[in-house]
Amino acid sequence: MVIAVDFDGTLFEESYPEVGAPKWDIINYCKRRKEMGDTLILWTCRARKRLKMAIRACKEVGLDFDYINNHTKESLKRYGRARRGCKILADVYIDDKAINPKELENDIFQNG
């Protein structure tokens, strides 16, 4: 399984442009999934110096990613080279700003 994980507010508390405190539940979940053989992608809007800060913070808590803001080799082989800024192809997206469409449907049906 390919899992794309956001940084700010997801792996670490929201503190942009700095790095917030680690969110250990999510970090440990990602570590377990990697140990199980899953592919992890760090998927963040951070760039340049701020991206390096995020990568360093992840390494300091023992979290290594297979890809950083990039598609897997299998995705590139199957779909070709993606343009910069394209959505990363993953089976699961973990992001503090995300909403599950099923939950949204339930809310719409219940609350109009």
Descriptions of predicted regions:
Residues 1-112:
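HAD-like aspartate-dependent phosphatase fold
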